[in-house]
């Protein structure tokens, strides 16, 4: 059992699948009981979780480190249960120490001043095979350092850290199964393994049993909206996507000047060789030409181009701070300061990316768009890649990529009176971060009547606190931005609040809604106090409800429900206003619908009106040419939170200036908050902060 609701059984029919890097994937089942109309329902779903591969800790640590440069020993070993091979004790790894067995010295009663390596040779006649791997601390209050090769990982332990990108790619291959396969697994294995075949004694006492078939619930399919560009109206296909060929943006942005930063980082096979590389110059001309054809006003002058030759990767500098310093020295050479810098990355190094965004957003106030050299220079699919980058560029320049057709019902409703759509999200530090690392809150809202431009307000707050502390101030900032751009205040405000579990809905009503109303009091209208109609909808994707069509005519080609499928009966709340909506077409596996739950409604939506509006706005996500799985304002808030994580990158990777890698016992929360505020500073500098910088 993992957590409260996930169950995994070791079975020859479903053996673990190796993910590489010391981990393996186990497939199991999630189960919970949910109230429904006149009955209880058992919510069962398949689930896949990463477990440690049993074996020698040093071997598995080495496999983990070999899998990616971004891998760090502490991220793998912290919290794992082991058995010591020399004494047979069972211990938990508290952390990975920075010292090596052949360097760390201590005083031994028997042998005097010795290294750990010497001690184990003299005491146990053990010659260490991995003297280059750091020691692990398996002590309690007092440190007890051991070489990892003297520890065996115990079986059946879930991995609670953050998966490497390489692990995630393998995990997707294991976990992604179409709905018919997952449904068969639940019926054929899940019910039996969860013990639902026969009623238990307590269930019999209450006359209860669990059905053997999937519940059938009614649903409907909403039509896709018509999409409008400045030139051309693409057809939305059955997968809720469309093509940008021969399309001009609805409103093109203006780029006054631009620079190009070429990062050179030891990936010579895919990198451009220098700022004067003819292939680079041709690529930039091709990109600029596509931007012009798409409606963006490009500067007549060629861009300034500089290169940054990054220092070699060094485990003594795990976050690559020296590389970021090199990048800074290159960017400041761009003179005069450009409106935007196109950064051509060498690879997907997340430390370089996070450091770059932190530098440019918070310190330099320079807008950036990042591309990877291996993708932008590849001839096959190059125009499509250019177009995808242009989507982001136009939005960062204040343009409008596409809108809903003027005859669309949702479009007409949105323009009946001034309306502001708001997205709110909070992201929290996970396992392996410095204890006390703040959570990050973001609020986005449209400033225009095309519902295209959604600048963001962001704050850090107490670690793992769900309620948004500074919501009043951030809402006031969004209202002021709306007022400046639209020359009026919105009379209706529709909030999509992401990231709230069902048990915390009351926090939004009791704590956050009053803060929103406090923001209203900071504004006045000609008629008196400002009091717009407010509706709050909570969005949730962390649930285990999945749908599978009972009739092929309602199914997409991959067996999932067709885009636009909405369910508001059978598995929804008994007395509340909620629904499940799958606006998007699935990429692979079983598609997850989003659960929308109305917790406050002054606008007085009908079910059909809100469902249709939410579906249509899911087609308004600016950097895509398809409907997205989460309504656009909430999606934007999620992206803004993710950008905020770049600014706290070291703390989120378990490293603090308070003294190396720390645990909760060592890190005082106020010290960490102070360190985080030093990283965050005043947030994103203007004028970058007034744009959709987070795309």
Regions found by a protein language model. Give the residues of each.
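Long, low-complexity, intrinsically disordered terminal regions
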Residues: 1-695
């Amino acid at each position: 059992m993992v957590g409260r609701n996930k169950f995994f059984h070791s079975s020859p029919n479903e053996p673990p699948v190796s993910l590489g890097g010391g981990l393996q994937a186990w497939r199991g089942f999630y189960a919970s009981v949910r109230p429904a109309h006149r009955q209880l329902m058992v919510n069962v779903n398949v689930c896949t979780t990463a477990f440690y591969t049993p074996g020698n800790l040093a071997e598995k640590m080495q496999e983990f480190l070999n899998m990616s440069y971004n891998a760090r020993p502490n991220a793998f070993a912290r919290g794992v249960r082991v058995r010591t091979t020399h004494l047979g004790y069972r211990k938990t790894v508290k952390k990975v120490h920075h010292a090596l067995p052949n360097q760390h010295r201590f005083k031994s009663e028997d042998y005097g001043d010795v290294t750990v390596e010497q001690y184990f040779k003299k005491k146990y006649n053990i010659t260490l095979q991995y003297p280059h791997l750091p020691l692990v601390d398996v002590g309690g209050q007092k440190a007890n350092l051991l070489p990892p090769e003297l520890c065996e990982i115990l079986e059946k332990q879930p991995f609670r850290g953050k998966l490497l990108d390489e692990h995630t790619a393998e995990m997707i291959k294991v976990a992604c199964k179409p709905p018919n396969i997952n449904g068969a697994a639940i019926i054929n294995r899940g019910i039996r393994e969860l013990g639902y075949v026969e009623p238990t004694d307590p269930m019999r006492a209450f006359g209860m049993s669990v059905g053997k078939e999937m519940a059938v619930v009614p649903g409907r399919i909403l039509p896709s909206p018509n999409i409008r560009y400045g030139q051309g109206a693409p057809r939305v296909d059955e997968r809720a996507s469309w093509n940008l060929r021969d399309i001009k943006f609805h409103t093109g942005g203006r780029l006054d000047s631009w620079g190009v930063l070429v990062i050179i980082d030891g990936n010579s096979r895919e990198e451009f060789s220098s700022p004067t590389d003819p292939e680079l110059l041709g690529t930039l001309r091709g990109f600029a030409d596509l931007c012009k054809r798409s409606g963006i006003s490009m500067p007549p002058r060629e861009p300034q181009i500089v290169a940054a030759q990054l220092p070699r990767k060094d485990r003594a500098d795990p976050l690559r701070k020296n590389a970021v310093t090199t990048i800074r020295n290159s960017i400041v050479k761009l003179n005069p300061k450009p409106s935007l810098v196109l950064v051509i990355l060498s690879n997907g190094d997340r430390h370089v990316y996070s450091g770059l965004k932190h530098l440019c957003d918070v310190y330099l106030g320079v807008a950036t768009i990042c591309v990877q050299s291996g993708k932008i220079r590849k001839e096959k699919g190059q125009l499509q890649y250019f177009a995808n980058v242009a989507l982001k560029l136009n939005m960062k320049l204040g343009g409008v990529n596409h809108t809903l057709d003027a005859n669309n019902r949702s479009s007409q409703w949105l323009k009946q009176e001034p309306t502001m759509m708001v997205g709110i999200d909070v992201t929290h530090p996970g396992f392996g971060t410095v204890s006390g690392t703040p959570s990050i809150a973001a609020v986005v809202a449209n400033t225009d009547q095309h519902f295209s431009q959604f600048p963001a307000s962001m704050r850090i707050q107490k670690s793992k606190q769900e309620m948004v502390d500074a919501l009043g101030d951030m809402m006031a900032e969004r209202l002021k931005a709306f007022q400046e751009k639209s020359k009026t205040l919105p009379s209706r405000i529709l909030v999509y609040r992401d990231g709230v579990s069902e048990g915390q809905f009351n926090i939004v009503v009791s704590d956050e809604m009053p803060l929103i109303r406090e923001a209203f009091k900071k504004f006045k209208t000609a008629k008196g106090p400002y009091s717009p109609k407010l509706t709050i909808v909570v969005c949730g994707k962390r649930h285990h409800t999945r749908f599978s069509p009972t009739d092929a005519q309602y199914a997409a080609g991959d067996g999932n429900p067709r885009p636009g499928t909405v369910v508001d009966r059978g598995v929804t709340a008994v007395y509340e206003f909620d629904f499940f909506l799958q606006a998007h077409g699935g990429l692979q596996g079983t598609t997850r619908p989003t659960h929308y739950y109305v917790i406050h409604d002054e606008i007085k939506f009908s079910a059909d009106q809100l469902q249709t509006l939410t579906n249509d706005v899911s087609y308004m996500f600016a950097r895509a040419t398809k409907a997205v799985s989460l309504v656009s304002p909430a999606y934007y808030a999620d992206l803004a939170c993710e950008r905020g994580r770049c600014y706290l990158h070291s703390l989120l990777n378990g490293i603090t200036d308070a003294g190396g890698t720390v645990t909760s016992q060592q890190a005082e929360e106020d010290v960490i908050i102070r360190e985080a505020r030093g990283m965050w500073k005043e947030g994103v500098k203007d004028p970058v902060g007034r744009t959709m910088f987070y795309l």
